[in-house]
A protein has these predicted regions:
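Histidine/lysine/aspartate-rich catalytic loop segments that bind and position anionic ligands
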Residues: 109-135
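Acidic, carboxylate-rich catalytic segments that either coordinate divalent cations
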Residues: 161-164, 170, 179-183, 187-200
Length: 200
């Protein structure tokens, strides 16, 4: 493993896929079967050349019991959410901007571009701003994600606007999504995990 590869783990050593426990190997295979093809399809790096997982996926391997349930929640959000993909990516980038989480912004800039969000809007979102070329619903999602992430509360006017835009079911889904990416950014920032390049 090169010095550059070692840095991709931040404070945690990148786990060798040939030295995993049975429980870790189950999580590793699950990530490779789901996130691996997704990462490849939108052109961001989720593992090294020798198969070590990077980004949030490496710390996820360290605690397979809890991580299995976290991945279940992530999968359920993707499967059952009432939010469209553009709104989801606006929310995820807005959370990442508050956390200043380089890898999350790197990966989801690629996902946002695939969802049809303009490069200018992506740059603005990753800087913590509100792009002009979003829909009104997307702008409300950005404001909600940013306010909740920064202040841990939503004021009454913004809550009313969110319910008008998404319905109560949609606001619950919005809140679940924000929470999932608080955990993701927390893993990345706790272990000082950076992006593998300077895309964001």
């Amino acid at each position: 493993m090169t010095a550059h590869t070692e840095k991709l783990g931040g404070r945690l050593p990148l786990l060798d896929p040939l030295a995993l426990s049975a429980a870790q190997k189950e999580i590793y295979d699950r990530i490779n079967a789901t996130f691996g093809p997704w990462a490849a399809s939108i052109d961001f790096q989720a593992r090294t050349g020798d198969g070590r997982l990077i980004g949030p996926f490496n710390p996820i391997l360290y605690s397979p019991g809890i991580s299995s349930s976290f991945l279940d929640l992530h999968d359920a959000e993707e499967k059952y959410t009432s939010l469209d993909e553009r709104v989801r990516q606006v929310v995820i980038l807005s959370v990442g901007a508050v956390w200043k989480s380089d890898y999350e912004l790197y990966a989801h800039s690629a996902a946002a571009q695939r969802a049809g969000i303009s490069e200018n809007a992506i740059r603005t979102l990753t800087a913590g701003g509100l792009p002009d070329d979003l829909s009104e619903q997307e702008k409300i999602a950005q404001r909600y994600a940013r306010e909740f992430s920064a202040k841990h509360r939503i004021d009454a006017d913004l809550y009313s606007a969110a319910v008008h835009a998404f319905g109560e079911h949609g606001v619950v889904d919005l809140t679940y999504l924000i929470g999932i990416y608080h955990i993701t950014c927390g893993l990345l920032n706790s272990f000082d995990i950076s992006a593998p390049d300077q895309r964001v």
